[in-house]
């Protein structure tokens, strides 16, 4: 995975001003290698991640959609241009990641944004985000959701967590996130697929009923 740590400084810098490709193509290469070795079913692979991993998920569910059967995007990036105007780290974005301001390379930032590739998206995508996130503003998830919902080419769901930031801190939100992620993957990778699973979760019923037993 070009741009990751553990292989020296030069390797870690390979994703600077090189968003999405080749770094997310490296993830796909890993999937294809596992398929070639007969370890996974090529039609039953999902992808998930948070923050930059959420960006990887959104990209994979749009630009590389034919390779993934399900995706769960958490506090992720969908628009590299609008992210500059809504994040609390614009200077870090320029100095470390993009190595450019939007006015320096507008077209590149647009084309490395998942929303640009939304018409290709056929992967069922669950999007979750904290409403109080200042690092990656929840509008990033709202944009991705609205583009995919408008196109109508794949199931999409948006879940927002009140009071949560760039990662859920409260136990209830952590549980809710985990259960939604697992259910989405179960539904599309092992279940019947099609329309999304019901929005409500069983733990909500248990809380309302005051019972620990599964309904």
Locate the predicted segments by residue.
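Active-site-proximal cap/loop segments of hydrolase catalytic domains
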Residues: 1-215
